[in-house]
Amino acid sequence: MSKPSILQQILTAVQDVDTKVDALQAQLTELDGKVQPLDGLSEQLTALDTKVTTIQDILGGAEVPDVPLPDNPLNKTRSRK
């Protein structure tokens, strides 16, 4: 059996590298999809910490702070036609 030419060896090596790069790109794309939902996590954790602190203060006997109530569509008056 004859030894493959140098050009064939280079082509095979390039194809191997290309396959590895494609696999790495797929892993990076998958990782990016998992990381994007974490972008707003810091703000969410800060808001949660504030709420937990407020609850702890209330349970500890502190004065209840004025907290704006969220809009509740069930409490709105409905017009009858």
Curated annotation (Swiss-Prot):
Region (Disordered): 62-81
Assigned keywords, A-Z: Late protein, Viral occlusion body
Pfam families, sorted: NPV_P10 (PF05531)
Keyword Ligase among UniProt keywords: no
GO cellular component terms, A-Z: viral occlusion body
Family: Belongs to the baculoviridae p10 family.
Functional note: Seems to be involved in the morphogenesis of the polyhedra. Forms extensive fibrillar structures in both nucleus and cytoplasm. It is involved in the liberation of polyhedra from infected-insect cell.
Protein name (Swiss-Prot/TrEMBL): Protein p10
Lineage of producing organism: Viruses, Viruses incertae sedis, Naldaviricetes, Lefavirales, Baculoviridae
